[in-house]
Swiss-Prot record:
The lineage of its organism: Bacteria, Bacillati, Actinomycetota, Actinomycetes, Bifidobacteriales. It comes from the Bacteria. Keywords: Cytoplasm, Elongation factor, Protein biosynthesis. PANTHER family: ELONGATION FACTOR P, ELONGATION FACTOR P (EF-P) FAMILY PROTEIN. Involved in peptide bond synthesis. Stimulates efficient translation and peptide-bond synthesis on native or reconstituted 70S ribosomes in vitro. Probably functions indirectly by altering the affinity of the ribosome for aminoacyl-tRNA, thus increasing their reactivity as acceptors for peptidyl transferase. It is found in: Cytoplasm. This is Elongation factor P. The keyword Cell wall biogenesis/degradation does not apply. Disulfide bonds: none annotated. It comes from Bifidobacterium animalis subsp. lactis (strain AD011). Pathway: Protein biosynthesis; polypeptide chain elongation.
Length: 187
């Protein structure tokens, strides 16, 4: 669908030279001299390559429509993750590469937003935070302050995160899926 660069938003899918690119970030710039332009950081949907690209303001572009669906993670199968559409109960195989590094926070039963274009999955978005159980951590000693009162801990998915000294094995913690940071205790 033809629109202009003024319609660019984060998450927009652009068709440039027959390839799909997702806008990661954008900025409309109006310099004191010269015409306005749009500076973007875009990611190739298929290859994952990230590039910076600048467009003239008002330039016509092809935007693609994307279907966002909420799917529930079921299990891992080789190089794919299997998700279930909870309305139709269809199982959908999604390549691990689409989930990327966030896979270490993926727990069975987690609802994720999956973007599709022409029936093909483009991206998987995990919730902003997940609740995970600590499976292993060393006891925290109060006098050990070499690292601002945190210690490494392994969660049930196998990911390693930094937690406060008072957190022990078996406790549930809230973890940010963007950077893996500890957000708090969960009861």
């Amino acid at each position: 669908m033809a629109q202009t660069t003024n319609d660019i938003k984060n998450g927009s899918i652009l068709n440039l030279d027959g390839q799909l690119w997702q806008v990661i970030k954008f900025q409309h710039v109006k310099p004191g001299k010269g015409p306005a332009f749009v500076r973007t950081t875009i990611k190739n949907v298929l290859s994952g390559k990230i590039v910076d690209k600048t467009f003239n303001a008002g330039m016509k572009m092809d935007f693609e429509t994307v279907d966002n669906r909420t799917l529930q993670y079921s299990y891992e199968d080789g190089d794919n993750f299997v998700f279930m559409d909870m309305t139709t109960f269809d199982q959908i195989m999604i390549p691990k590469t689409l989930v990327g590094d966030k896979a270490k926070y993926l727990l069975e039963g987690t609802d994720c937003i999956v973007s599709f274009h022409d029936g093909q999955p483009l991206s998987v978005e995990l919730p902003a935070s997940v609740v995970l159980t600590i499976t292993h951590t060393e006891p925290g000693l109060q006098g050990n302050r070499s690292n601002a009162g945190t210690k490494p801990a392994t969660v049930e998915t196998g990911a390693e995160i930094q937690v406060p000294l008072f957190i022990g094995e078996g406790e549930k913690v809230k973890v940010n899926t963007d950077d893996g940071s500890y957000l708090g205790r969960e009861n």
